[in-house]
A protein has these predicted regions:
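Hydrophobic alpha-helical segments at protein termini of multi-pass membrane proteins
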Residues: 1-293
Length: 293
């Protein structure tokens, strides 16, 4: 037993963010947020709504820890048995808990601000931004754990791989929601929720099994697949917009350039942090490994 709930919560939900880590995590959230909000082609972007869902997500995310504790202490479920036990833990434990946590801020916004939901793509953008809020908080926890390790590789590793998986798994649920609302068949929503949780769980399984590089290739492959899957879902949602206008074309080349430039910025930022902490020669080596990664 954890003693009084309040002590437990304050102890567990404490995050130590130093300026550079908060900046790194914010940079990542901003770069992906900017990239995905550019899919709003027909109706002006609703920045206030995006901000609200982001903040809600940041506030709700730390409570994941409470759910994990219930899983561990009340159900004695740690996933430390064999491979199958591991898979079950990551799908039902991790995938289930984290997808529920990311869907909640979107659900709140959809219910409270239903008037502001103008077209199908709005649901996807909210899901994406909620995932970014989740990843932002999670990145603070991870960067904090790895802080002062030999270098800041963890920043760009998490900025690309984990964030895309979080966005994909969140967005697919709301893509299922759009489909279900349009075709009046619940199977789309149910199917997408299952797909989201299983994908999330399996990605984590591959990542934690990454002693062998084979699994790492799997998880990397999942990220690439997810990135293209996201573009497909966004395109499909745009085609269903009541405000569809064939003259507003998605600026694919420009967006690809923006994405590459922003990821470059993350690398440069990592380089600066490295140089400040460990000196330039070390930073040069790290940058080289990062570029090859």
């Amino acid at each position: 037993h954890h003693g009084p709930l309040l002590t437990y919560l304050t102890f567990n939900l404490e995050l130590y963010g130093t300026w550079d880590l908060i900046l790194a995590a914010s940079l990542i959230a901003l770069l992906w947020g900017y990239y995905f909000t550019r899919f709003k082609l027909f109706v002006p972007k609703d920045y206030l709504l995006y901000f609200i869902v982001f903040i809600l997500s940041c506030l709700i995310t730390p409570f994941c820890i409470v759910l994990y504790d219930i899983l561990h202490f009340s159900f004695q479920f740690y996933g430390d048995g064999g491979f199958l036990d591991h898979v079950m833990y990551y799908i039902f434990g991790v995938g289930g808990i984290e997808e529920l946590t990311k869907a909640l801020p979107v659900l709140i916004c959809v219910l409270v601000f239903s008037k502001r939901m103008k077209e199908p793509v709005d649901y996807l953008i909210l899901a994406t931004v909620s995932a970014l809020g989740f990843a932002f908080m999670e990145n603070l926890m991870y960067f904090d754990q790895y802080y002062g390790n030999s270098n800041f590789d963890v920043i760009h590793n998490r900025s690309v791989l984990s964030v895309i998986m979080h966005i994909f798994c969140s967005t697919i649920i709301w893509y299922g929601f759009i489909k279900t609302r349009m075709l009046k068949k619940i199977k789309y929503l149910v199917g997408c929720i299952v797909l989201s949780i299983v994908t999330h769980g399996m990605y984590d399984v591959f990542l934690t099994q990454s002693v062998s590089s084979v699994f790492y290739v799997f998880s990397f492959g999942m990220v690439v697949f997810s990135f293209f899957g996201l573009k497909m879902m966004y395109n499909s949602a745009l085609n269903q917009s009541p405000f569809f206008n064939p003259n507003n074309v998605y600026p694919a080349n420009e967006n690809a350039f923006i994405l590459i430039a922003s990821l470059g910025m993350v690398l440069i930022f990592e380089f600066i942090l490295d140089a400040i902490r460990f000196g330039a020669p070390h930073a040069n080596d790290s940058l080289l490994t990062s570029l090859l990664a």
